[in-house]
Design a protein with these regions (language model features):
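Conserved kinase catalytic-core helix
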Residues: 80-83, 87-90, 119-161, 165-166
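Alpha-helix N-cap and loop-to-helix initiation/capping positions
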Residues: 69-72, 138, 200
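Short glycine/proline- and charge-enriched loop/turn segments
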Residues: 59-64, 128-133, 187, 200-206
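Active-site acidic catalytic loop and adjacent metal/ATP-binding pocket
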Residues: 40-45, 52-54, 148-193
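Soluble, non-transmembrane catalytic domains of enzymes that act on hydrophobic metabolites at membranes
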Residues: 1-12, 19, 26-27, 99, ...
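Conserved ATP-binding subdomain of kinase catalytic cores across diverse folds
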Residues: 18-122, 151, 155
Length: 238
């Protein structure tokens, strides 16, 4: 059994799964054992020299009422990447996703995305002194961009599921009034749609509050911007 999403095939005659599976590069996340299988991430490059990230999995599945026998987790991540992109939520560009099940029912699965050029984790952005370099007006716009991004995701009833500060990436280009701020979300492996936007929002925002270093004042500012798009308050965020 084979499942494929291909944005760019290496060639008309080459099997894209085997092409990307056989590419080797530096391990960003060493293969680890979980969910009854193995998962790791490598940096590779395509024929044009673009930096790509390849998530490789063997027997790494999740179960749900729709998939009681198990489904590769990269397929759930693919669903989230495509859905969030359609909601104008910044996420890595999907190049290839595929899963193959052998006769012994063991899955091999692969997710390939384009590297986020110029983006850094929000905590690393602070640690590098970018807030001081850019000034408070730009910092306010960073909080605004994060709040708006999360609100768009939640209005689509999508829950990130693992929303820590390390999964929020920012890019600031230019300075002063001309500065542009972009936000991207990573690690969507646990993402899923909830029955309501409120449920998605409540889970993610409480999780982010616990796993971020923003002060109470900064958090209140982020939530203020969030509500300008989401349209209503989320209980229990303080």
């Amino acid at each position: 059994m084979t499942v494929d999403f291909v944005q760019q095939s290496p060639s008309a005659t080459e099997d894209p799964f085997e092409f990307y599976w056989n590419q080797q590069g530096e391990w960003v996340e060493e293969p680890n054992q979980r969910r009854g299988g193995e998962s790791g991430v490598q940096r590779i490059h395509d024929g044009e020299g673009r930096l790509l990230y390849a998530k490789r999995q063997v027997g790494h599945t999740y179960r749900s009422w729709r998939y009681p026998l198990g489904r590769p987790t990269v397929l759930r991540e693919q669903d989230a990447l495509l859905a969030l992109s359609a909601l104008s939520v910044g996420v890595p560009e999907l190049v290839y996703c595929g899963a193959q099940q052998a006769t012994d029912k063991q899955w091999r699965a692969l997710l390939v995305t384009v590297g986020l050029e110029g983006f850094v984790e929000i905590d690393n952005w602070y640690a590098a002194g970018e807030r001081e370099r850019c000034g408070e007006a730009v910092h306010d716009r960073v909080l605004e961009a994060i709040g708006h991004t999360l609100a768009r995701m939640h209005l689509g009833r999508w829950q990130h599921g693992c929303l820590y500060a390390k999964h929020v990436f920012v890019r600031v280009t230019g300075q002063g009034e001309g500065a542009e701020v972009d936000v991207a979300l990573l690690d969507l492996e646990k993402s899923r749609q909830r029955l309501t936007a409120q449920k998605a929002a409540s889970h993610d925002l409480k999780q982010l509050r616990r796993h971020s270093s923003w002060s109470a004042t900064e958090w209140d500012r982020l939530i203020y911007f969030y509500k300008t798009v989401f349209g209503s308050a989320i209980k229990g965020l303080r």
